[in-house]
Amino acid sequence: MNVKILLLLVGLNLVMHSNATGDSETNPAETLFIEEIFRRGCFKEGKWCPKSAPCCAPLKCKGPSIKQQKCVRE
């Protein structure tokens, strides 16, 4: 029983390692940069942004008046 579990773990490790080192077809434009990773408790793009909570990086709170501001990209 323990041998089967060990072999399954080794096999899974090999599969995961080959996926990590293989060529990825990820488009760099689709990936998030470090500064775009959303913090907890921040507002995302298009949401109203009161003074009590910030917009997620790299968004800024902008609008025609204080009561009509939304999180937008600069």
UniProtKB/Swiss-Prot annotation:
Annotated tissue distribution: Expressed by the venom gland.
Propeptide: 21-40
First and last residue of the signal peptide: 1-20
Record bears the keyword Metal-binding: no
Localisation per UniProt entry: Secreted
GO cellular component, one term: extracellular region
Keywords noted in UniProt: Disulfide bond, Ion channel impairing toxin, Knottin, Neurotoxin, Secreted, Signal, Toxin
Major site of localization recorded for this protein: secreted
Keyword presence, Signal: yes
One annotated GO molecular function: toxin activity
Disulfide bond sites: C42-C56, C49-C61, C55-C71
One Pfam family per UniProt: Toxin_7
Similarity remark: Belongs to the neurotoxin 35 family.
Domain notes per entry: The presence of a 'disulfide through disulfide knot' structurally defines this protein as a knottin.
Record's function text: Putative ion channel inhibitor.
Protein name as it appears in the record: U12-theraphotoxin-Hs1a
Organism: Cyriopagopus schmidti
